[in-house]
């Protein structure tokens, strides 16, 4: 079983998961009949497992469902090869078996098995079937960090998930119903694959512009909408972000808050170039929504 785990190709990134890596060490200890190291690695494995669940099956299922791998990326574009498909099937069958392994299964292979360890739970179900359903729903559920989170910021050119996003809901927003409905309709068009516009929201501070965008992101997250907040001094990074998101099956709002310029602001030229387009073309998966607080004398 350890050799099969070491030989993962499609789900190779699972080996970087802390609990999976610790479980691999348990398998290694069983191969070596090493009870002393088995005890230590069991404590490490359960410490990592218990941070999320006491069920190994559920933990591994979640790791598989959220995996970003070549097959899920190629599936989104309809380009999974026969070889990749075969590898995927074999690995899913193995991971399903792995998710059912208990402490008793492992200690049965030790000559001097410790009797003081407390095991973990397993449960029924098929990881392979669950993953096939996830592939069919990739346009709504996503993969990798996009499967777990729906709001992101940009740091050093990389997307960073917002682990505790603003829980703002549309029904909590007062006033401006007509204006808000236009933004909602535009967002729905984006999700439906129809032409969608870039949007500029302007008005006095405290009128709910930012809250409306965050509430829309929350409302449509289950339909495959993700929000990326970009600061004004990060405008030059938008073309790279667009390239990175172009093949992603989800839909994205690039959200730029507090968009005000001085007369000699280089960011204005960057924004103008972005809106006018580039050789890369305009993505049908990304809409840009801007917030202008109308506190600058410069008109956009």
Model-based region annotation:
Residues 1-174, 178:
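AAA+ P-loop ATPase mechanoenzymes
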Residues 257-259:
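Walker B catalytic acidic pair
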